[in-house]
């Protein structure tokens, strides 16, 4: 198959964790990967590693520019067959210690950008009678705790948006799924920035390469057995 005929997978939130490993997994399966991140250097690294991939510097909270990037990907690569919405923003702070504007910023990245991406990509998916949209989430999508008033509402809304899309477009050939990752993910950022994570054993973390494998598996499900809500956690995670 010529490179121009290979399907395109679009991934937001490319980094050294879930986003990067998901890009590797889809590239391994023969996809051309359109990668979105805020850091050019990170994108260059993955472009060099994954032949046929292409990086786009984009802050998904800039909704007008996000739409511009979607058009650019369609023109330069082709309409994405798969969207993995992995970009995330969260502030973990008690209500009275935080700032109300945090909620709006988090909402734009976690939820509104998914709406914009879906609104742009779904018409081509409908035309082709196939497509996959997967959003990655966490337990904040299912419950709020004292330190998540600026984060949990945005993830809950993200999940409900995904559910609405699944109910609308599933019968039309588009598979929409929501993956809840119920654990800390083993990345350098998690290890170095969160004090109580530094000395944890690897088995206490969800491994990003394993998450990526599950994301890919879900994207390939047969139409008679599609998943929507999928929960991933290490075997020793309490839940």
Question: Can you say where each PLM-predicted feature lies in the sequence?
Answer:
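Conserved glycine-rich Rossmann-like NAD(P)H-binding loop of the short-chain dehydrogenase/reductase
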Residues: 31-45
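C-terminal helical subdomain
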Residues: 171-180, 198-239
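Catalytic loop of short-chain dehydrogenase/reductase
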Residues: 132-157, 163, 167-170
């Amino acid at each position: 198959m010529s490179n121009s005929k290979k399907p395109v997978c679009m991934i937001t939130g490319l980094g050294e964790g879930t986003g990067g490993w998901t890009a590797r997994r889809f590239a391994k399966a023969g996809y051309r990967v359109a990668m979105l991140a805020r850091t050019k250097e990170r994108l260059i690294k993955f472009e060099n590693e994954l032949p046929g991939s292409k990086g786009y510097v984009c802050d998904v909270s800039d909704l007008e520019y996000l739409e511009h990037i979607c058009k650019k990907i369609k023109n330069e690569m082709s309409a994405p067959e798969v969207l993995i919405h992995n970009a995330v923003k969260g502030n973990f702070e008690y209500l009275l210690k935080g700032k109300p504007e945090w909620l709006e910023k988090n909402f734009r990245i976690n939820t509104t950008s998914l709406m914009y991406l879906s609104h742009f990509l779904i018409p081509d998916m409908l035309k082709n009678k196939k497509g996959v949209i997967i959003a990655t989430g966490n337990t904040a999508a299912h419950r709020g705790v004292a330190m998540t008033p600026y984060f949990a509402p945005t993830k809950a809304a993200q999940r409900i948006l995904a559910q609405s899309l699944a109910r609308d477009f599933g019968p039309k050939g588009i598979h929409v799924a929501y993956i809840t990752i119920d654990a800390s993910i083993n990345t350098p950022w998690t290890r170095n920035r969160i004090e109580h994570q530094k000395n944890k054993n690897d088995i206490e973390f969800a491994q990003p390469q394993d998450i990526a494998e599950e994301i890919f598996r879900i994207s390939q499900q047969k139409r008679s057995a599609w998943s929507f809500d999928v929960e991933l956690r290490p075997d020793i995670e309490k839940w």
